[in-house]
């Protein structure tokens, strides 16, 4: 019986041939030059400086913005009223100081 033959390790290896150029899909100039990230940066980031946008995209700016309230400074007015009520309550709880004139 003959021993089983092994393939030679040092022999030449065959490489897969690339497909002919006709079989490759044709791509336009923009698809060839730009990839997905390039389109992302071109579309979403504003043209102004980095300090103005805080590094956010336009979409993030629209989602996380403080919309102007048509009533004006409502929070400020409400805080002033609450502070006044708190002061009134504190004055009522404290006894009035005695003076010599009264």
From Swiss-Prot:
The record, for InterPro entries, names:
NUPR1-like
Q: Which domain of life is it from?
A: Eukaryota
In its UniProt entry, what is this protein called?
Nuclear protein 2
The Gene Ontology biological process annotation of the record reads:
cellular response to starvation; DNA damage response; negative regulation of cell population proliferation; negative regulation of transcription by RNA polymerase II; regulation of cell cycle
| Disordered: annotated span | 1-26, 46-102
Q: What does the protein in this record do?
A: Acts as a transcriptional repressor by inhibiting gene expression at the NUPR1 promoter in a p53/TP53-dependent manner in cancer cells. Involved in the G1 cell cycle arrest, and in a decrease in cell viability and cell proliferation of pancreatic cancer cells. Plays a role as a negative regulator of the protumoral factor NUPR1.
Compositionally biased residues, Basic residues: 85-102
State its location(s). Nucleus
Q: Which Pfam families match?
A: Phospho_p8
User: What's a GO cellular component annotated to this UniProt protein?
Assistant: nucleus
Q: What keywords is this UniProt entry annotated with?
A: Cell cycle, Growth arrest, Nucleus, Repressor, Transcription, Transcription regulation
The text of the family note is: Belongs to the NUPR family.
């Amino acid at each position: 019986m003959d021993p089983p033959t092994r393939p030679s390790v040092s022999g030449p290896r065959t490489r897969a041939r690339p497909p002919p150029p006709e079989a490759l899909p044709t791509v336009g100039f923009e698809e060839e030059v730009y990839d997905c990230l390039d389109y992302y940066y071109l579309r979403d980031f504003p043209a102004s400086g980095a300090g103005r946008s805080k590094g956010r995209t336009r979409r993030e700016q629209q989602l996380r913005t403080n919309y102007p309230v048509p009533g004006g400074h409502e929070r400020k007015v409400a805080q002033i009223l609450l502070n006044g009520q708190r002061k009134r309550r504190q004055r009522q709880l404290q006894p009035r100081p005695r003076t010599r004139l009264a």
